[in-house]
Amino acid sequence: MNIEQARFNMVEQQIRPWEVLDQAVLDLLYTVRREEFVPEQYRALAFSDLEIPIGEGERMLQPKVEARILQEVAPKKTDKVLEVGTGSGYMAALLASRARHVQSVEIHPALKSFGETNLRRAGIANVTVEVGDAAARGWPRHAPYDVIVLTGSTPVLPEALLDQLAPGGRLFAVVGEAPVMEARLVTSVGDGSFNTVDLFETVLAPLRNASAREKFVF
């Protein structure tokens, strides 16, 4: 496989047509090498438009979704980021390349180790990975955050996560239950108020222990 040609095809045929037009984001996809975050047995699929298995029943996001998230939350060099669900470490690597620091929380110890190893090998030093369950309660010990990214879906968006956004902070989450889910960007405008934009429809596996929607019994 010609890796650089495959990377080029991923950017031009999958990602750019998906309304990812920020040139800084597109350029980053050439410098943060996705194939180095993919399990060895799936390296040939590193640039494919699919969710690659990474163990523990979890999968990497599709490349176009990763790029779109980065474009929408638009991290700045002064930003502190919370990532819920480290996985392979690739999304954290993209965020860290634009932000001051990324605090990533992974519920599976094996994936914490996998993500940390990948990040270390890639020379990315401004990511801290911790084992924990941040799906419903966030990670208040380092709050507030300028950016929060959930790498799995949640039936409802927990108030705790919104409360951990700094003024002007942006949160990306896929909200809902299959088959109806929306990728959503929530921006804190201060005084406990938020601006919400639905970006696109998708279906994404839920985070472990994500907040459940209340069920009404008649």
Predicted regions, residues:
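Class I SAM-dependent transferase core
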Residues: 1-82, 90-94, 98, 111-127, ...
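Conserved nucleotide-cofactor-binding alpha/beta core module
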Residues: 74-191
